Design a protein with these regions (language model features):
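Negatively charged, low-complexity tracts enriched in Asp/Glu with abundant Ser/Thr
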Residues: 1-33, 58-59, 87
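Mixed-charge, Lys/Arg-enriched low-complexity segments
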Residues: 3-7, 52-90
Length: 90
């Protein structure tokens, strides 16, 4: 479950926050326009976050990865944005 403290890591200047609740967060990166759906099923372990990603609103989501916390997931999204904006290379 995402707490109100967890949700504070979502910077509204960096992300367009589409929806949030106790188990799900949907955001769009203002830098790349990519959409991210973050789900916390609390199973098999509390704190697990499954990260889904899509490039356009009309595209389907694909699983991008997992994180231990919402903050860790957001760091990964920002890292992905840097990679994307750098011509998809490090």
């Amino acid at each position: 479950m995402f707490s109100s403290e967890d949700l504070k890591c979502l910077d509204p200047q960096y992300f367009s926050i589409i929806t949030t609740d106790a188990y799900d967060v949907t955001i769009m990166s203002r830098n790349t326009g990519h959409y991210w759906y973050l789900h916390n099923p609390e199973y098999p372990d509390q704190g697990t976050v499954i990260i889904f990603h899509k490039h356009k609103a009309s595209h389907p989501y694909h699983q991008h990865g997992r994180a231990n916390t919402l903050r860790q997931a957001v760091r990964g999204i920002r890292k992905h944005d840097r990679w994307q904006m750098n011509g998809r290379k490090w």
